[in-house]
Protein backbone atom coordinates (compact mmCIF):
# COMPACT_ATOMS: atom_id res chain seq x y z
CA UNK A 1 0.00 0.00 0.00
CA UNK A 2 1.51 3.31 -1.10
CA UNK A 3 0.56 6.43 0.81
CA UNK A 4 1.00 9.86 -0.70
CA UNK A 5 2.18 12.29 1.98
CA UNK A 6 2.47 15.96 1.05
CA UNK A 7 4.77 18.09 3.22
CA UNK A 8 5.01 21.90 3.16
CA UNK A 9 8.31 23.67 3.87
CA UNK A 10 8.85 27.42 4.20
CA UNK A 11 12.04 28.98 2.88
CA UNK A 12 12.08 31.99 0.57
CA UNK A 13 8.68 30.87 -0.65
CA UNK A 14 6.31 27.98 -0.15
CA UNK A 15 6.95 24.85 -2.13
CA UNK A 16 5.55 21.36 -1.94
CA UNK A 17 7.59 18.21 -1.49
CA UNK A 18 5.85 14.91 -2.10
CA UNK A 19 7.08 11.72 -0.53
CA UNK A 20 5.57 8.26 -0.96
CA UNK A 21 5.40 6.12 2.17
CA UNK A 22 5.16 2.37 1.80
CA UNK A 23 3.34 0.56 4.60
CA UNK A 24 5.49 -2.15 6.19
CA UNK A 25 2.72 -4.43 7.40
CA UNK A 26 -0.87 -4.83 8.51
CA UNK A 27 -2.64 -5.32 11.84
CA UNK A 28 -4.82 -8.25 12.87
CA UNK A 29 -7.00 -7.07 15.75
CA UNK A 30 -10.03 -8.26 17.74
CA UNK A 31 -11.67 -4.93 16.87
CA UNK A 32 -13.34 -5.00 13.46
CA UNK A 33 -15.34 -1.79 13.89
CA UNK A 34 -14.45 1.58 15.37
CA UNK A 35 -17.11 1.53 18.07
CA UNK A 36 -15.63 -0.30 21.03
CA UNK A 37 -11.95 0.26 20.28
CA UNK A 38 -10.00 1.61 23.30
CA UNK A 39 -9.33 5.31 22.90
CA UNK A 40 -5.70 4.87 23.92
CA UNK A 41 -3.20 1.99 23.98
CA UNK A 42 -2.67 -0.03 27.19
CA UNK A 43 -6.19 0.70 28.50
CA UNK A 44 -7.22 -2.86 27.61
CA UNK A 45 -4.28 -5.17 28.43
CA UNK A 46 -6.21 -8.19 27.10
CA UNK A 47 -6.40 -6.68 23.60
CA UNK A 48 -3.81 -8.76 21.75
CA UNK A 49 -2.93 -7.72 18.20
CA UNK A 50 -0.58 -9.12 15.59
CA UNK A 51 1.43 -7.08 13.10
CA UNK A 52 2.25 -9.11 10.00
CA UNK A 53 5.14 -7.55 8.10
CA UNK A 54 5.18 -7.47 4.31
CA UNK A 55 7.02 -10.34 2.56
CA UNK A 56 10.09 -8.20 1.80
CA UNK A 57 10.90 -7.98 5.53
CA UNK A 58 12.71 -10.99 7.00
CA UNK A 59 13.61 -11.77 10.60
CA UNK A 60 16.74 -9.68 10.06
CA UNK A 61 14.57 -6.55 10.09
CA UNK A 62 13.43 -7.26 13.66
CA UNK A 63 16.69 -8.67 15.05
CA UNK A 64 17.11 -7.33 18.58
CA UNK A 65 13.53 -6.08 18.86
CA UNK A 66 12.62 -8.82 21.34
CA UNK A 67 15.02 -7.22 23.80
CA UNK A 68 12.54 -4.38 24.33
CA UNK A 69 9.37 -4.61 26.41
CA UNK A 70 7.46 -1.88 24.57
CA UNK A 71 7.44 -0.64 20.99
CA UNK A 72 6.15 2.43 19.20
CA UNK A 73 3.86 1.60 16.30
CA UNK A 74 3.21 4.29 13.72
CA UNK A 75 0.13 3.63 11.62
CA UNK A 76 -2.50 5.10 9.31
CA UNK A 77 -6.04 5.89 10.47
CA UNK A 78 -7.24 4.29 7.25
CA UNK A 79 -10.90 4.16 8.26
CA UNK A 80 -10.97 7.93 8.82
CA UNK A 81 -9.45 9.01 5.49
CA UNK A 82 -12.80 9.69 3.85
CA UNK A 83 -13.90 11.80 6.83
CA UNK A 84 -11.18 14.39 6.25
CA UNK A 85 -9.67 16.46 9.03
CA UNK A 86 -10.44 19.55 11.09
CA UNK A 87 -8.34 22.18 12.86
CA UNK A 88 -10.59 21.97 15.92
CA UNK A 89 -11.89 18.70 17.39
CA UNK A 90 -13.88 17.61 20.46
CA UNK A 91 -11.79 15.34 22.73
CA UNK A 92 -13.86 12.69 24.58
CA UNK A 93 -12.05 13.57 27.83
CA UNK A 94 -13.74 16.99 27.71
CA UNK A 95 -17.22 15.53 27.36
CA UNK A 96 -17.36 15.95 23.61
CA UNK A 97 -18.42 19.60 23.93
CA UNK A 98 -15.28 21.71 24.29
CA UNK A 99 -13.01 22.06 21.25
CA UNK A 100 -9.23 21.83 21.12
CA UNK A 101 -6.73 22.21 18.30
CA UNK A 102 -6.16 18.96 16.46
CA UNK A 103 -2.42 19.03 17.27
CA UNK A 104 -3.28 19.18 20.99
CA UNK A 105 -5.25 15.93 20.73
CA UNK A 106 -4.92 12.35 19.51
CA UNK A 107 -7.89 12.60 17.19
CA UNK A 108 -7.78 10.39 14.06
CA UNK A 109 -9.03 13.33 12.01
CA UNK A 110 -5.57 14.71 11.34
CA UNK A 111 -4.06 16.25 8.18
CA UNK A 112 -2.08 13.09 7.33
CA UNK A 113 -4.16 10.66 9.42
CA UNK A 114 -1.04 9.24 11.09
CA UNK A 115 -1.35 7.65 14.52
CA UNK A 116 1.14 6.50 17.15
CA UNK A 117 0.60 3.76 19.75
CA UNK A 118 2.81 2.43 22.52
CA UNK A 119 2.27 -1.35 22.69
CA UNK A 120 3.66 -4.04 24.95
CA UNK A 121 5.72 -6.47 22.89
CA UNK A 122 4.78 -10.08 23.58
CA UNK A 123 6.87 -12.05 21.10
CA UNK A 124 8.11 -12.19 17.51
CA UNK A 125 7.86 -15.23 15.26
CA UNK A 126 7.96 -16.31 11.63
CA UNK A 127 5.06 -18.22 10.10
CA UNK A 128 5.25 -19.40 6.49
CA UNK A 129 7.97 -16.87 5.75
CA UNK A 130 6.09 -13.89 7.22
CA UNK A 131 7.34 -12.05 10.29
CA UNK A 132 4.65 -11.60 12.94
CA UNK A 133 4.93 -9.25 15.91
CA UNK A 134 2.49 -9.98 18.74
CA UNK A 135 1.59 -7.16 21.11
CA UNK A 136 -0.69 -6.55 24.11
CA UNK A 137 -2.77 -3.50 24.96
CA UNK A 138 -3.75 -2.77 21.37
CA UNK A 139 -6.03 0.08 20.30
CA UNK A 140 -5.94 -0.53 16.54
CA UNK A 141 -8.65 -1.46 14.07
CA UNK A 142 -8.34 -4.74 12.21
CA UNK A 143 -6.64 -4.14 8.86
CA UNK A 144 -4.75 -1.02 9.98
CA UNK A 145 -1.67 -0.32 7.79
CA UNK A 146 1.54 -0.03 9.82
CA UNK A 147 4.04 2.63 8.72
CA UNK A 148 6.93 2.11 11.12
CA UNK A 149 8.02 0.35 14.32
CA UNK A 150 10.57 1.65 16.82
CA UNK A 151 11.67 0.46 20.28
CA UNK A 152 10.53 2.36 23.36
CA UNK A 153 13.50 3.57 25.43
CA UNK A 154 12.34 4.45 28.97
CA UNK A 155 15.21 6.68 30.15
CA UNK A 156 14.68 8.93 27.14
CA UNK A 157 10.94 8.84 26.62
CA UNK A 158 9.38 8.25 30.06
CA UNK A 159 8.37 11.59 31.61
CA UNK A 160 5.88 10.71 34.39
CA UNK A 161 6.03 14.20 35.92
CA UNK A 162 5.31 16.04 32.67
CA UNK A 163 2.25 18.28 32.35
CA UNK A 164 -0.59 16.60 30.45
CA UNK A 165 -2.81 19.54 29.52
CA UNK A 166 -6.51 18.75 29.80
CA UNK A 167 -5.83 15.02 30.35
CA UNK A 168 -5.81 14.31 34.09
CA UNK A 169 -5.11 10.70 34.95
CA UNK A 170 -6.57 7.47 33.64
CA UNK A 171 -10.29 7.43 32.77
CA UNK A 172 -12.69 6.05 35.36
CA UNK A 173 -13.65 2.43 34.73
CA UNK A 174 -17.25 1.25 34.68
CA UNK A 175 -18.40 -1.77 36.65
CA UNK A 176 -19.44 -4.89 34.73
CA UNK A 177 -22.61 -6.94 35.23
CA UNK A 178 -23.56 -9.99 33.16
CA UNK A 179 -27.23 -10.69 32.55
CA UNK A 180 -27.88 -13.59 32.87
CA UNK A 181 -25.11 -14.26 35.37
CA UNK A 182 -24.07 -17.53 33.71
CA UNK A 183 -23.47 -15.82 30.35
CA UNK A 184 -19.67 -15.50 30.71
CA UNK A 185 -19.38 -19.24 31.41
CA UNK A 186 -19.78 -19.77 27.66
CA UNK A 187 -16.61 -17.78 26.94
CA UNK A 188 -12.92 -18.46 27.37
CA UNK A 189 -11.15 -16.50 30.10
CA UNK A 190 -9.29 -14.51 27.41
CA UNK A 191 -12.48 -13.50 25.59
CA UNK A 192 -14.26 -12.62 28.81
CA UNK A 193 -11.38 -10.39 29.95
CA UNK A 194 -11.20 -8.71 26.54
CA UNK A 195 -14.92 -7.94 26.44
CA UNK A 196 -15.06 -6.74 30.05
CA UNK A 197 -11.97 -4.54 29.78
CA UNK A 198 -13.17 -3.03 26.48
CA UNK A 199 -16.65 -2.14 27.72
CA UNK A 200 -15.38 -0.88 31.10
CA UNK A 201 -13.80 2.00 29.15
CA UNK A 202 -17.30 3.24 28.18
CA UNK A 203 -17.13 3.20 24.37
CA UNK A 204 -20.11 5.54 23.97
CA UNK A 205 -19.65 9.01 22.48
CA UNK A 206 -18.84 11.38 25.34
CA UNK A 207 -22.03 13.40 24.81
CA UNK A 208 -24.32 10.35 24.87
CA UNK A 209 -25.96 9.18 28.11
CA UNK A 210 -29.06 7.14 27.35
CA UNK A 211 -29.47 4.40 30.01
CA UNK A 212 -32.36 2.77 28.16
CA UNK A 213 -30.46 2.39 24.90
CA UNK A 214 -29.04 -0.99 23.92
CA UNK A 215 -25.66 -0.79 22.18
CA UNK A 216 -23.96 -3.35 20.02
CA UNK A 217 -20.39 -3.91 18.92
CA UNK A 218 -18.20 -6.70 17.59
CA UNK A 219 -15.20 -7.87 19.62
CA UNK A 220 -13.04 -10.88 18.71
CA UNK A 221 -15.71 -12.40 16.49
CA UNK A 222 -18.53 -11.95 19.02
CA UNK A 223 -21.54 -9.66 18.67
CA UNK A 224 -21.94 -8.04 22.08
CA UNK A 225 -25.12 -6.27 23.19
CA UNK A 226 -25.09 -4.10 26.30
CA UNK A 227 -26.50 -1.05 28.02
CA UNK A 228 -24.92 1.41 30.45
CA UNK A 229 -26.66 2.75 33.52
CA UNK A 230 -25.26 4.53 36.59
CA UNK A 231 -21.63 3.70 35.81
CA UNK A 232 -22.49 0.05 35.25
CA UNK A 233 -22.18 -1.88 32.01
CA UNK A 234 -24.88 -4.53 31.76
CA UNK A 235 -23.88 -7.14 29.17
CA UNK A 236 -27.06 -8.63 27.73
CA UNK A 237 -25.85 -11.07 25.10
CA UNK A 238 -22.70 -12.39 23.45
CA UNK A 239 -23.18 -14.27 20.18
CA UNK A 240 -20.40 -15.86 18.14
CA UNK A 241 -20.29 -14.71 14.52
CA UNK A 242 -18.14 -17.64 13.41
Predicted regions and their residues:
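Short coil-to-beta-strand transition motifs
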Residues: 18-23, 109-118, 220
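Arg/Lys-rich, positively charged N-terminal/basic patches that mediate binding to nucleic acids
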Residues: 17-60, 65-67, 152-198, 206, ...
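Short solvent-exposed strand/turn elements
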Residues: 129-152, 240-242
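Conserved positions in beta-strands of structured domains
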Residues: 28, 119-122
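Active-site-adjacent substructure of cysteine-protease-like catalytic cores
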Residues: 62-115, 207-211
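Short, conserved beta-turn/loop elements at beta-strand boundaries and strand-helix junctions
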Residues: 32, 124-130
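Enriched for short, Lys/Arg-rich terminal
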Residues: 229-242
Amino acid sequence: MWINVTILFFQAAFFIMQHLIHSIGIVSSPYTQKFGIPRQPQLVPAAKICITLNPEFSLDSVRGLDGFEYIWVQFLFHDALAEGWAEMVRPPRLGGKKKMGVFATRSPHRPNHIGLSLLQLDYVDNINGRVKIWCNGGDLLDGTPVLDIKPYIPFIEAKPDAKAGFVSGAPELLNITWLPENLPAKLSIEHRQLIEQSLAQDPRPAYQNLPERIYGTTIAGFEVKFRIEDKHVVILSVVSLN
